[in-house]
Amino acid sequence: MMAGMKIQLVCMLLLAFSSWSLCSDSEEEMKALEADFLTNMHTSKISKAHVPSWKMTLLNVCSLVNNLNSPAEETGEVHEEELVARRKLPTALDGFSLEAMLTIYQLHKICHSRAFQHWELIQEDILDTGNDKNGKEEVIKRKIPYILKRQLYENKPRRPYILKRDSYYY
């Protein structure tokens, strides 16, 4: 009887370790997929004039995922009819709702990852440079003639400032 309990205990331990390893593999796989997705998105060349539509769509999807909890729900101003309709939906679409919830959770994790937030800031900077471009060009236009003038007209050797000015320096 003792041997039977030891065998059952060993089987339970093997089952537990295998399930833990499967969970860690799936988490590592998710992290790898997220990293690949974000590096491909970040390393692709970004045009300053035109932002690719899929990147803007991803930004829109992230804003939609972030706005799932509307302000009306947070303050408690939701009508009872809407709550009843929402309660009936998961029971009718059981398998689909679980898959949709998992997809929304994965999108939520991707949208809140640090790499994506960094890419989003870069994207906003690129979109804002179109507005600030005129101001930067004015600054450059003021500096360029001075630099060109200094480079073009410095053909003669510089006069040492320590020595006295005499006629032979002119």
Swiss-Prot record:
One GO MF term on file is: neuropeptide hormone activity
GO cellular component assignments? axon terminus; extracellular region; intracellular membrane-bounded organelle; transport vesicle
| Protein localization | Secreted; Cytoplasmic vesicle, Secretory vesicle
**Mind listing the UniProt keywords for this protein, alphabetically?**
Cleavage on pair of basic residues, Cytoplasmic vesicle, Pyrrolidone carboxylic acid, Secreted, Signal, Vasoactive
* Site feature Cleavage, where: P160, Y161, I162
- Single Gene Ontology BP term? signal transduction
The signal peptide annotation in the UniProt record is: 1-23
Answer yes or no on keyword Methyltransferase: no
Its domain of life reads Eukaryota
**A Pfam family hit:** Pro-NT_NN
Q: Where in the sequence is Pyrrolidone carboxylic acid found?
A: Q151
Q: How does it assemble?
A: Interacts with NTSR1. Interacts with SORT1. Interacts with SORL1.
Family affiliation? Belongs to the neurotensin family.
Give the matching PANTHER family: NEUROTENSIN/NEUROMEDIN N, NEUROTENSIN_NEUROMEDIN N
User: Main role?
Assistant: Neurotensin may play an endocrine or paracrine role in the regulation of fat metabolism. It causes contraction of smooth muscle.
What is the protein's given name? Neurotensin/neuromedin N
Protein source organism:
Homo sapiens (Human)
